[in-house]
Amino acid sequence: MSDTMKGTGSCLCGAIRIIANNLSNKVGACHCGMCRKWGGGPLMAVNCGTDVSFEGEGNISVFNSSDWAERGFCNKCGSHLFYRLKERKQYIIPMGLFDDQETFVFNDQLFIDKKPSFYSFANKTNDMTEAEVLDKYAGN
């Protein structure tokens, strides 16, 4: 099975359709404070690379959340649409937005050292600390 595929999805109200041509099947959970504050818990998302398009782009608002990334949301229903690395133009999109989720595999946990102690996932995953994540992504 390929690690990437084409995926389609939408926001909660349907005002925005997502087309990701290189959607990874590997789901990652981010436990950083920003993601938990943004969504009320860990962000469960997939890397979609740069080949992503949206129908209904006029309904997308973007929040500049750090020096290296921004977050998009539907300005009609509030659905979280993406976390985008600015320089790479790389999209990380919440997996729950996609129509077909059966091929996803839970693979990574980011900012594992920031995860609150009141929850944990049973899946065996590749875990990265805050320092490891920042070293890999913040400078790019």
Locate predicted features.
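A short Gly-Trp-Pro
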Residues: 1-140
